[in-house]
């Protein structure tokens, strides 16, 4: 060997802690929140994360001389304190782009959140954010359609889209399921939806559900003169079965299908997204299992990272929480990852949890989906928070109407249109919410009953995962 090789073990910071390094535009940047074991220096912990998520191993190996380790290694170039947390710190790591397969979110996550999360030197580790370089973004497929194409396909403009999940989500026969879909769509919704765990169970095989849903959609379209859709969940136990279900939805003339992207996996999701673009189908994405990964404030992967990865992997709509409903998520954090789904450029903004500038180039945007414990009284806040390029989904807030699902759908549609009209007239939706809704309720008995039914329903629990900002 032409170079001297010294066997043994050396500290990670001797190789992977490089505070003088200036990241390149082509580097993939990551921010980790690290909590090390007692007595381990911050620099050693951060360097260990950089090493174990890139080229490193626990000992010096002779085969390092066969490559250019200095070119390929991950580098921790900055450490920051976490406001209000004396145990943890932020480690900023730069990875050369050649460490990752082009267009493969699976490969990126395998490196960044792989074995390193079981490292003994760490008590906790959380991936807070990723800056994807433009060279990597251009190699990804992205959303199969995007916001503008979806609006054109559905012929719906100037307002958020309106939907609901069919309830009860499990136990209905295919025919009864289709009946509930019809009631919701004729009442005024744009979409109805399979819940994440409805696939092909003994009480309702997928072919049966697809056929009755297609019948309900076509009948509601004839009655209302509007384009309607239902998120047919094609998530299955094998990719082959998933594509069979997607093909059948296409044969039935359905505009949109659905995938559980975390339980289904990024590889399956990217493949399905490519299929959707080739076959002219919209793709709705459910985030089932996300809270297992993202809810702990010190360990796991923040949802903003999952949202970024989904935009790259492919999807036209993604659940994001509601801020005001029953699910976790504060306002500023939610706005931060909504920006990552929809905007072409998102600047660094710690007040929204964005640690890096993120340039998305010409990649299409993704509709943010608000779903979970919302009802008509939430409509003004939802329209304010989520804006027009969103889908507002009321499950219990539709089916729980005393007069049934059609009346619940009508109430939500009237409330939405009243809020959009008030906003366009320059009114402050959140400050004037009661006046706006009560006035609309005078002309809609369905809305009036809904307002009375849901007036005491609130979900006032504190957020577990809060932004790390200085008070």
From Swiss-Prot:
Enzyme Commission designation: 4.1.1.39
Residues of the site described as Transition state stabilizer: 326
Cofactor binding summary note: Binds 1 Mg(2+) ion per subunit.
Family: Belongs to the RuBisCO large chain family. Type I subfamily.
Active-site residues per Swiss-Prot or TrEMBL entry: 167 (proton acceptor), 286 (proton acceptor)
Name of the gene this protein is made from: cbbL
List of residues binding substrate: 115, 165, 169, 287, 319, 371
Single GO term (MF): magnesium ion binding
Binding site residues for Mg(2+): 193, 195-196
Metal-binding found in the keyword field: yes
Keyword annotations: Bacterial microcompartment, Calvin cycle, Carbon dioxide fixation, Carboxysome, Lyase, Magnesium, Metal-binding, Monooxygenase, Oxidoreductase, Photorespiration, Photosynthesis
Cofactor list: Mg(2+)
Protein name: Ribulose bisphosphate carboxylase large chain
The protein's assembly and partners: Heterohexadecamer of 8 large chains and 8 small chains.
Transmembrane segments: none
Enzyme class at the top of the EC tree: lyase
Pfam family, one: RuBisCO_large_N
Organism: Synechococcus sp. (strain WH7803)
NCBIfam families: PRK04208.1
Job of this protein: RuBisCO catalyzes two reactions: the carboxylation of D-ribulose 1,5-bisphosphate, the primary event in carbon dioxide fixation, as well as the oxidative fragmentation of the pentose substrate in the photorespiration process. Both reactions occur simultaneously and in competition at the same active site.
Residues recorded as bearing N6-carboxylysine in the entry: 193
Note: The basic functional RuBisCO is composed of a large chain homodimer in a 'head-to-tail' conformation. In form I RuBisCO this homodimer is arranged in a barrel-like tetramer with the small subunits forming a tetrameric 'cap' on each end of the 'barrel'.
InterPro entries per UniProt: RuBisCO, RuBisCo_large_chain_AS, RuBisCO_lsu_C, RuBisCO_lsu_C_sf, RuBisCO_lsu_fd_N, RuBisCO_lsu_N_sf, RuBisCO_lsuI
Subcellular location: Carboxysome
Catalytic reaction equation(s): 2 (2R)-3-phosphoglycerate + 2 H(+) = D-ribulose 1,5-bisphosphate + CO2 + H2O; D-ribulose 1,5-bisphosphate + O2 = 2-phosphoglycolate + (2R)-3-phosphoglycerate + 2 H(+)
